[in-house]
Amino acid sequence: MPEKGRAGEAAAASFLEEKGMKIMERNFRSPRTVRGGEVDIIALDGETLVFAEVKTWSTREIDALEQSIDNKKQRKIIETAKYFLSLNRKYIYMAIRFDVIFISPEGITHLASAFTERV
């Protein structure tokens, strides 16, 4: 992973912790056989399990950033979240949320509930 991406994920994790969330996993991967991918951050926000995708960009063109999380990427994140839940059954009855965190030189933009499983 490029240094910019690592730094962005570290900033996003710190940001979520400052908001009172507990970071449970970073860079969680599912096997290729599951058709998933990677979830950058898995966190607890009270009684809600949050799966967060972090995007680090050198500009703050929010439209381009939002388009970077297309339906295919959303499906991969959802499949990876399902795989995480299959391994961690104690969380299967919790509320689930999919967030996107954009990191740019201007700051952090956190989109809670950026997409849902209906993708």
For every predicted segment, state its role.
Residues 1-28:
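Acidic-basic catalytic patches of nuclease active cores, encompassing PD-(D/E)XK
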Residues 39-60, 77:
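Conserved catalytic cores of phosphodiester-cleaving nucleases, focusing on short active-site segments
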Residues 48-50, 99, 109:
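Protein kinase-like catalytic core scaffold
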Residues 22-49:
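Active-site metal-binding core of divalent-cation-utilizing nuclease and nuclease-like domains
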Residues 27, 40-42, 55-57, 101, ...:
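Anionic group-transfer/hydrolysis microenvironments
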Residues 31, 56-106:
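Catalytic cores of nucleic-acid endonucleases
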Residues 1, 5, 9, 35, ...:
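Short, conserved glycine- and acidic-residue-centered signature motifs
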Residues 103-119:
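Short, low-complexity, polybasic intrinsically disordered segments
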